[in-house]
């Protein structure tokens, strides 16, 4: 059936069709090659915005540092990072005056978190800069490596498993004259292959000990590794993002915990809530402004955009904010929170992989690592790269660039939101002391500003005052990219408001379709996405029904599981036809086994195996869900699993879907090619780590293992737990005497082995 798309819009107001203009269908652009150029851009731009600041040299690392705080007040509209410290402190004081006790209470909440958080909090997150190997690793591996190095250097506070004790080790490590680390390296040898008699390169992985002096260690500890941000839609140029190492992460986590606690209490903050809760919060602020602007007042809203938010923020500013927020708090607490901004004031940006050169004539390729950029002859580079390198050279140390000003993306989202809200807070009439007043919403660098005044001149004056106040704390509202409208129509964090929020359905488009996990999960995720969009995003019944039919079609093409009686010939159709013919109750077959689709918009919440169970032949049931069938997934059956879905905007969301283990919930194996690379040693470490953690969780279901288990090691804890459990099971008659004594014997053997080691 062909539809003329223009007909769809005849009865729609333009705002409701906004979502069709978004660049969200199709694959997003990915970056290839090195991010070195983008990182140099960031470093150079950040310094340019603060160029009138004071230069100093870090006594420990010798890095040149630029401090723009209390720099000259701006004379034009160019973005600048010259925040005035007294202005920031005053904004904080007024914020506290409007919300009595807010800082005090948040500090108390945070203090509790600080004392309870376990070091395993740092294992969350995919890529983390691993300073021991000088490259990115999964967070769990990077943490394990760091703790291992600390331990071999006599730092043992972290054995107790509290994050705060790990951070004590980090502080101590910075005072050490040198650190000994273990690095992986690979040797290449040319050997003759016995089978083919050809020469092949054989790689072996070795571990070697290396000593790092205080200066080099500090540089590594303060380094943020950089990568290119992938999958950004609607941009022509890519940009660099940073991933900090384990030394910085824990401190940042506590600062963000404090800031999050403050944001939760601020009605203008778009963080940390999301989804419908966020929409409700925003609608409240708009309602307040519109009710107050009765017939006498005009009300306008700016859909705001800030120029280079991160690059104009300054860690020194955040230090001042934290010092103010934690006044009257215990010394240890103030110290632990001030470390993150201090480390960021001294941060180094790693320039990434460097540049790749190739000669067409000689068919040669060579990599110029970032470390060489300081000394290489610039005649090899093109004009723009040459300029970048010349500019960054004074800042380079060991392949990293000193980057004192600026924040790097996504590090202090909550704290910078507090700063933004403190300026919105100054819009109350008691502070503006005139006829105009403002309020608004802030979520990291995105804001919406609502200004009320008796006439247009007042609105203009209010906007100007807001603009200038922002400049004083290093926030640069972009006059080119912000636009103003009568209140009632604006956009904030990709929510479009028109007398209420319009569903921006296109944002969800990328998450429709077949995920490619396995037949069982894909079916479940597919219908859950449709269900969720009916609940949250105005997906109407007719469209949902159509989405469902398209999904089933897509699913059948992906897994080549067309109906059993189809004429389509695929590699699977021969087997599926046989199954179809020998099945009595054909309605009971899974869609992925050539069965019919029984889903409609009323039963999307039911897993397929439950939906069809009563309709299945008995032997089909027996094959699908029999734990003795080697193809049934042997993971414990959890009622829900988490899938990662990619909305078009913002980070990947985790979405729950029902998981029932059947023969279709298989798990694909890891790609073998990694086993031949230098990553292999790391992979083995990671698997060991994974196995130990899984084993530990078997002994201590999550409820009991989150709490500190005293000073005993993991093995001791597991052995004693095994003994207790075995005794209980034996006394209650769940296990026989022979089994009980066997368990006890194994426990003793393990302890014996530990003693010998």
From Swiss-Prot:
Residues 50-81 are annotated as: Disordered. InterPro entries: RNA-dir_pol_NSvirus, RNA_pol_PB1_influenza. Residues 286-483 form the RdRp catalytic domain. One of its GO terms (molecular function) is RNA binding. Residues 55-64 have a biased composition (Polar residues). Phosphorylated by host PRKCA. Its main location: host cell. Keywords: Eukaryotic host gene expression shutoff by virus, Eukaryotic host transcription shutoff by virus, Host cytoplasm, Host gene expression shutoff by virus, Host nucleus, Host-virus interaction, Inhibition of host RNA polymerase II by virus, Nucleotide-binding, Nucleotidyltransferase, Phosphoprotein, RNA-directed RNA polymerase, Transferase, Viral RNA replication, Viral transcription. Its EC number is 2.7.7.48. It is an enzyme of class 2 (transferase). One of its GO terms (cellular component) is host cell nucleus. The keyword Nucleotidyltransferase applies. Pfam families: Flu_PB1. One of its GO terms (biological process) is symbiont-mediated suppression of host mRNA transcription via inhibition of RNA polymerase II activity. It catalyses: RNA(n) + a ribonucleoside 5'-triphosphate = RNA(n+1) + diphosphate. Residues 249-256 are annotated as: Promoter-binding site. RNA-dependent RNA polymerase which is responsible for replication and transcription of virus RNA segments. The transcription of viral mRNAs occurs by a unique mechanism called cap-snatching. 5' methylated caps of cellular mRNAs are cleaved after 10-13 nucleotides by PA. In turn, these short capped RNAs are used as primers by PB1 for transcription of viral mRNAs. During virus replication, PB1 initiates RNA synthesis and copy vRNA into complementary RNA (cRNA) which in turn serves as a template for the production of more vRNAs. Influenza RNA polymerase is composed of three subunits: PB1, PB2 and PA. Interacts (via N-terminus) with PA (via C-terminus). Interacts (via C-terminus) with PB2 (via N-terminus); this interaction is essential for transcription initiation. HAMAP family: INFV_RDRP. Belongs to the influenza viruses polymerase PB1 family. This is RNA-directed RNA polymerase catalytic subunit. It comes from Influenza A virus (strain A/Swine/Colorado/1/1977 H3N2).
């Amino acid at each position: 059936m062909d539809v003329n798309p223009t007909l769809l819009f005849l009865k729609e107001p333009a705002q409701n069709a906004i979502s069709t203009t978004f660049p969200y269908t199709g694959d997003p652009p990915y970056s290839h090659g090195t991010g070195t150029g983008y990182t140099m851009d960031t470093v150079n731009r950040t310094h340019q915005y603060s160029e009138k600041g004071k230069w100093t040299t870090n006594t420990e690392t010798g890095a040149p540092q630029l401090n723009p705080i209390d720099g000259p007040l701006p004379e034009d509209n160019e973005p600048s990072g010259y925040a005035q410290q007294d202005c920031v402190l005053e904004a904080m004081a007024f914020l506290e005056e409007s919300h009595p006790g807010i800082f005090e209470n948040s500090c108390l909440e945070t203090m509790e978190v600080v004392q309870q958080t376990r070091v395993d909090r740092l294992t969350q997150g995919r890529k983390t800069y691993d300073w021991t190997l000088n490259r990115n690793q999964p967070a769990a591996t990077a943490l394990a490596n760091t703790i291992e190095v600390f331990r071999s250097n006599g730092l043992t506070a972290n054995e107790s498993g509290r994050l705060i004790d790990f951070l004590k080790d980090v502080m101590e490590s910075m005072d050490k004259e040198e650190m000994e680390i273990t690095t992986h390296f690979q040797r290449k040898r040319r050997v003759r292959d016995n089978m083919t008699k050809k020469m092949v390169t054989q790689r072996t992985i070795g571990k070697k000990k290396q000593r790092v002096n205080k200066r080099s260690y500090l540089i590594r500890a303060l380094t943020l590794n950089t990568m290119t941000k992938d999958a950004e839609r609607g941009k022509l140029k890519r940009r660099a993002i940073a991933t900090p190492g384990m030394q910085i992460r824990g401190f940042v986590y506590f600062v963000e915990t404090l800031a999050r606690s403050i944001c939760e209490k601020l009605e203008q903050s778009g963080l940390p809530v999301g989804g419908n809760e966020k929409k409700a919060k925003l609608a409240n602020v708009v309602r307040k402004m519109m009710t107050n602007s009765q017939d006498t007042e005009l009300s306008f809203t700016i859909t705001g955009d800030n120029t280079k938010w991160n690059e104009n923020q300054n860690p020194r500013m955040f230090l001042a904010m934290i010092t103010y927020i934690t006044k009257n708090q215990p010394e240890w607490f103030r110290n632990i929170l001030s470390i993150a901004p201090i480390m960021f004031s001294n941060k180094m940006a790693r320039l990434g992989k460097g540049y790749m050169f190739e000669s067409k004539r000689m068919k040669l390729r060579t990599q110029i690592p970032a470390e060489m950029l300081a000394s290489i002859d610039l005649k090899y580079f093109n004009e723009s790269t040459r300029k970048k390198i010349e500019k960054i050279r004074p800042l380079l140390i060991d392949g990293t660039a000193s980057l004192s000003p600026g924040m790097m993306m996504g590090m202090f989202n909550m704290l910078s939101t507090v700063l933004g809200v403190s300026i919105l807070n100054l819009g109350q009439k008691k502070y503006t002391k005139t006829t105009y007043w403002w309020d608004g919403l802030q979520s990291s660098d995105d804001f919406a500003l609502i200004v009320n005044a008796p006439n247009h001149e007042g609105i203009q004056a209010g906007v100007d005052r807001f603009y200038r106040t922002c400049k004083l704390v290093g926030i640069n509202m972009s006059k080119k990219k912000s636009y103003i409208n009568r209140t009632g129509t604006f956009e904030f964090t990709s929510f479009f408001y028109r007398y209420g929020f319009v569903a921006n359905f296109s944002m969800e488009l990328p998450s429709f379709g077949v995920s490619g996990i396995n037949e069982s999960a894909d079916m479940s995720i597919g219908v859950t996405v449709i269900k969720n969009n009916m609940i949250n995003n105005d997906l109407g019944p007719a469209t949902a029904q159509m989405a469902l039919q398209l999904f089933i079609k897509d699913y059948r093409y992906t897994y080549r599981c067309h109906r059993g009686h189809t004429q389509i010939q695929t590699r699977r159709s021969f087997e599926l036809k046989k199954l179809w013919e020998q099945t009595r109750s054909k309605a009971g077959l899974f869609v992925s086994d050539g069965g019919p689709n029984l889903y409609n918009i009323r039963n999307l919440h039911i897993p397929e195996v439950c939906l069809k169970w009563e309709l299945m032949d008995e032997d089909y049931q027996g094959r699908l869900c029999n734990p003795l069938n080697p193809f049934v997934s042997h993971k414990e059956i959890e009622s829900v699993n988490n899938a990662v879905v990619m909305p078009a905007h913002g980070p990947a969301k985790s979405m729950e879907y029902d998981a029932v283990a059947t023969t279709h919930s298989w798990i694909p194996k890891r790609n073998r090619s990694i086993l031949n690379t230098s990553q292999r040693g790391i992979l083995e470490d990671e698997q060991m780590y994974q196995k130990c953690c899984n084993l530990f969780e078997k002994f201590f279901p999550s409820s009991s293992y989150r709490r500190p288990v005293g000073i005993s090691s993991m093995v001791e804890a597991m052995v004693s737990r095994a003994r207790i459990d075995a005794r209980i099971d034996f006394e209650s008659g769940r296990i026989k005497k022979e089994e009980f004594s066997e368990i006890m014997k194994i426990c003793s053997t393990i302890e014996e082995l530990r003693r010998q080691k």
